[in-house]
Amino acid sequence: MELATAGKVNEVLFMNRGEGESSYAQNSSFTQQVASMAQPALENAVETLFSRDFHLQALNAADLGCAAGPNTFAVISTIKRMMEKKCRELNCQTLELQVYLNDLFGNDFNTLFKGLSSEVIGNKCEEVPCYVMGVPGSFHGRLFPRNSLHLVHSSYSVHWLTQAPKGLTSREGLALNKGKIYISKTSPPVVREAYLSQFHEDFTMFLNARSQEVVPNGCMVLILRGRQCSDPSDMQSCFTWELLAMAIAELVSQGLIDEDKLDTFNIPSYFASLEEVKDIVERDGSFTIDHIEGFDLDSVEMQENDKWVRGEKFTKVVRAFTEPIISNQFGPEIMDKLYDKFTHIVVSDLEAKLPKTTSIILVLSKIDG
């Protein structure tokens, strides 16, 4: 199935479910690492909300693209802890926290809500009672009533696209990104342009929807996968997709995958530069940029001394967030072979010395009026 429409992507874009060894819940250590780096930005956003004269009785916060790992629990705990701190400082009496957890319909909401222990949300007798609700649906459209949210958080979700970029086949119906699943050094310029155009369209839709839902002077804290350099085909920003394409091509050569399935598949994700993100926000004009920064991190797997252990652990992380969409295109029956091949490529081609991963932290405030 070619991922040419938003409806198709929405059906298959989710992290691996459950709590098994290939699940996202068990393989989200890197995004936890990213979230810990972004925690000060979230803390500052809550502080900022208290400095703006909202006369709050309840703070309404949304975590968009929450998945089902422990990262969402850390977000809730951080917001709640900062609210309790400010309440003690300001002698607030009846402040409550309402958190909306959003992701697409295929998300493992059962595992997510099973993890919402009293340690995360506390109890209703505490100084800041916390109430949690699930909100399934695409964040590229409206999810909440007008002027209903004070704080929006999203981590490692906004770089996913509503569909594979348009215009990646010729008039004759030939694939323009043959043998690849993302931008690469061999991709023609039209592929790069199509990916940036799709990200521009989708991120603008995201901002437009939030501009209607967030109250004036409300805050958004967005963490997304990105890149430091201007070249989107730089190995640091596309190595995961490049290695996956190599693994798929190996199975094509063995007759296990039809070549046309590889040629017509383009991953619906884009790792933008800081300049591209900034430009889209400024063009939209609904939010001011309070803070934007990029930072590079080694994956936690790099702490392992043995290259095979590093490679296998990295494969589990990649499988956790790619298997549903990859399986939908190429078939569940060859997933074990595919990710085993991926491990061998990681170890032999890179000696499991993985490039650093770039993340972008973006803090926005809704313009008043």
UniProtKB/Swiss-Prot annotation:
pH dependence per the entry: Optimum pH is 8.5.
The EC number on file is 2.1.1.160
Cofactor binding summary note: Binds 1 Mg(2+) ion per subunit.
Residues that bind caffeine: 31, 156, 159-160, 225, 321
Provide the site residues for: Involved in substrate discrimination.
Answer: 153, 225, 269, 317, 332
Q: What class of enzyme is it?
A: transferase
Q: Name the job this protein performs.
A: Involved in the biosynthesis of caffeine. Catalyzes the conversion of 7-methylxanthine (7mX) to theobromine and of theobromine to caffeine. Has 3-N- and 1-N-methylation activity.
**Listed name of the protein:** 3,7-dimethylxanthine N-methyltransferase TCS1
Source organism of the structure? Camellia sinensis
Source gene?
Answer: TCS1
